[in-house]
């Protein structure tokens, strides 16, 4: 008896997920494999990918355009949370996994499949993100992960595929492992496994080298409504267009590269290179607008929530009770995070140089040091006395021994 009757396979068109098709059928006795390729803005032509799955033995090959849903329902909430794993990684890849898992589960329901499958290995974070998300959405659905069990090298995987008519890659395989979507790119493996080695320029695609960036700065005004990006330079834009345009404009000036040692969920450290020009600028701009519109106590408390939120998403707990609770808090804080942030792009930098909001809590007459100052300086003495009282009591007791 096979491990499943009918399987929905998350499909990218690469060697591993292509080999999963005959492997599931011939090694694990799956009677029917239906592939699902999800368009998240990775730039691949999806019709050739769909045909490739059919040629590899899939009984049906599905394609889902999920770009708008990806940005609106996954990226924008993460921007509202200022989500940066370990204060650096904006979760560009991690955010895609719960959406793909959701679409897999929906396809399984629609086509009556008793299992879903993915091509993740046993070493990365994505296997956790897929398996846990699928379990949260449908705990009765089996999850199959052939690449986690088959134990084949890259060469053996290619040879196995050739037995079933899956052609070997035409060009020499890149030494890098690359994942891409509309939010950015992640690059790892190959020469990058040496943490001392500077990445070659060939690894980058979305961001220009500094020496090739414009010699004049560019300004972009980003409009937000309730914490959600809605416009560039006063032009209302749909989510996909907004992120796409910002990627191009920011990347042209060389901003958006991350080179970090990252703590994976499975317990190992890995060297990761990321490109996320638009996403990083949106997070920076959003955080700055919050500094203008949130009270100090809410803003400071939210920073701790953001760290927990980022860790949950990175660790595959998008669909979890704690994540839902954090979502509720974050949404409450965003009601007045509305306004415009001006960002200056120049030679690998993206700096906020202006911000305005109809809900601004900044009061010039209180902040100024000029003649129009309305702050009551006489009130400071009493405040300082009360504020410093615990410290004075502590110091007195310390002197008394």
UniProtKB/Swiss-Prot annotation:
Location of this chain's protein in the cell: Cytoplasm
Indicate yes or no for the key word Cytoplasm. yes
What's the main place this protein lives? cytoplasm
> Per the record, what are the reactions this protein catalyses?
L-citrulline + L-aspartate + ATP = 2-(N(omega)-L-arginino)succinate + AMP + diphosphate + H(+)
Biological processes annotated in GO = argininosuccinate metabolic process; L-arginine biosynthetic process; urea cycle
Give any Gene Ontology cellular component. cytoplasm
Subunit description: Homotetramer.
**Class of this enzyme:** ligase
Q: Which UniProt keyword terms apply here?
A: Amino-acid biosynthesis, Arginine biosynthesis, ATP-binding, Cytoplasm, Ligase, Nucleotide-binding
Q: Which residues bind L-citrulline?
A: 89, 125, 129, 177, 186, 262, 274
* Family of the protein in this entry: Belongs to the argininosuccinate synthase family. Type 1 subfamily.
Q: What is the originating organism of this protein?
A: Thermosynechococcus vestitus (strain NIES-2133 / IAM M-273 / BP-1)
List its EC numbers: 6.3.4.5
Q: What pathway is it annotated to? A: Amino-acid biosynthesis; L-arginine biosynthesis; L-arginine from L-ornithine and carbamoyl phosphate: step 2/3
Q: List the CDD domains.
A: ASS
Question: A single Pfam family, by name?
Answer: Arginosuc_synth
Name assigned to this protein: Argininosuccinate synthase
Which PANTHER family does this UniProt record tie to the protein? ARGININOSUCCINATE SYNTHASE
Chain sites annotated for binding L-aspartate: 121, 125-126
Please indicate which superkingdom the organism of origin belongs to: Bacteria
* GO molecular function, a single term: argininosuccinate synthase activity
Q: Does the keyword RNA-binding apply?
A: no
Task: Write down the InterPro entries for this protein, in alphabetical order.
Answer: Arginosuc_syn_C, Arginosuc_syn_N, Arginosuc_synth, Arginosuc_synth_CS, Arginosuc_synth_type_1_subfam, AS_cat/multimer_dom_body, Rossmann-like_a/b/a_fold
Q: Where does ATP bind?
A: 10-18, 119
